[in-house]
Amino acid sequence: RTKRDVCELPFEEGPCFAAIRVYAYNAETGNCEQLTYGGCEGNGNRFATLEDCDNACARY
């Protein structure tokens, strides 16, 4: 997958319940948003920091 592909994926919180704060790119708004990740599964549209999300997706 390319970075563009990852950034176009919808955020998936996954089935677990760890409640980890992460950032994901919202292709509809064109912004990275803070969301809650369950800690397992999900997809590549998940970043530890806002900066990582912006660097990967914000202006692709």
From Swiss-Prot:
Q: Which residues form the propeptide?
A: 1-2
- Annotated site residue numbers, Reactive bond for chymotrypsin: 17-18
Q: List the disulfide bonds.
A: 7-57, 16-40, 32-53
MF annotations from Gene Ontology: serine-type endopeptidase inhibitor activity; toxin activity
UniProt entry tagged with the keyword Metal-binding: no
Where does it localize?
A: Secreted
Task: Read off the InterPro entries from this record.
Answer: Kunitz_BPTI, Kunitz_BPTI_sf, TFPI/VKTCI-like
Question: Which GO terms of the cellular component aspect does the record hold?
Answer: extracellular space
Q: Where are the transmembrane segments?
A: none
Q: Does the UniProt entry include the keyword Disulfide bond?
A: yes
Give a brief account of the tissues where this protein occurs.
Expressed by the venom duct.
Instruction: Please provide the record's keywords in A-Z order.
Output: Disulfide bond, Protease inhibitor, Secreted, Serine protease inhibitor, Toxin
Ranges of residues in domain BPTI/Kunitz inhibitor: 7-57
A Pfam match = Kunitz_BPTI
In the record, the note on similarity to other proteins reads: Belongs to the venom Kunitz-type family.
| Domain free text | The cysteine framework is IX (C-C-C-C-C-C).
The name of this protein is: Kunitz-type serine protease inhibitor conotoxin Cal9.1c
